[in-house]
Amino acid sequence: IGCYAVTDRVVDEIWAFVAGALDNGQARIPVHAFPFRMTERNMRRRSGDKWAPFWDNLKTGHDLFAQEGVPPKVSVCEGRYVFEPGEASTVDSAVEERCPKEVAGRTPL
């Protein structure tokens, strides 16, 4: 668990979104946080870092959200995140441990 520094104006905006979601029956509010803006340029600049394989894995979910506009469905398999397209009805889904056959057996990150 960590924290992010935000201004009062930004925290007020976050609070309004969370309160609105809860008031309208949403049970969970997923937060997808990334270590930096995951542009191609930033990924290249950090490609030699020891965390690069992990960041490459996160970028898959980042790009899926950017493409679809809905948070992806996330599962964990053998030490890595697995992302699938999300739907508005699955926004409050929890992360689950599930290994699709194309991921099972790979070396964990």
Language-model-detected regions and their locations in the chain:
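Exported/periplasmic cell-wall-interacting domains
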Residues: 1-105
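N-terminal targeting segments with Sec-dependent signals, encompassing both cleavable signal peptides
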Residues: 108-109
